[in-house]
């Protein structure tokens, strides 16, 4: 009888340990996926900032340097309207221009978290900024859509007012 009780207790303890181990491993996978998502977004943000810093007033003014030879500073600055401004030029260049940056990809995650990148222009009255929004499904349970947002003022925009 004592052996039977000891066996039942041992089974209960081992079952509990197995459950905790399973939950810990699942949590670890979610953490790895979250780290991969955040790293992918951070890498993409750095590439966008690098692309912005490559668009300079000097490069826009020089038609023979191999950079932005089909664009000039006047075109880059635009007319200051919602559809023609420095931020929209930056958005076009990052999307499919000479300094284009591909959307982030998740190659190391085991699940598709539908990571998306969207651009929009923010009107600040006399100037405009580029808003870059990343959207993805959180890897943890009970976590819905998450967003990461950055706002960029084009680095060459100061040259538009000279």
Where would I find each of the regions flagged by the language model?
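Low-complexity, Gly/Pro-rich coil/beta segments used as flexible assembly/activation regions
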Residues: 42-162
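Aliphatic-rich helix starts adjacent to a transmembrane/signal segment
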Residues: 1-45
């Amino acid at each position: 009888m004592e052996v039977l009780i000891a066996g039942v207790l041992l089974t209960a303890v081992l079952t509990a340990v197995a459950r905790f181990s399973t939950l810990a491993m699942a949590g670890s996978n979610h953490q790895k996926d979250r780290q991969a998502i955040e790293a992918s977004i951070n890498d993409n943000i750095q590439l966008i900032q690098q692309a912005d810093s490559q668009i300079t007033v000097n490069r826009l003014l020089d038609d023979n340097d191999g950079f932005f030879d089909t664009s000039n500073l006047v075109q880059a600055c635009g007319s200051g309207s919602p559809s023609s401004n420095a931020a929209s030029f930056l958005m076009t260049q990052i999307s499919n221009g000479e300094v284009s940056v591909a959307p982030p990809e998740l190659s190391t995650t085991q699940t598709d978290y539908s990571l998306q990148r969207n651009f929009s222009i923010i009107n600040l009255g006399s100037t405009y900024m580029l808003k870059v929004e990343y959207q993805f499904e959180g890897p943890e349970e009970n976590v819905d859509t998450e967003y990461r947002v950055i706002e960029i003022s084009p680095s060459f925009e100061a040259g538009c007012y000279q």
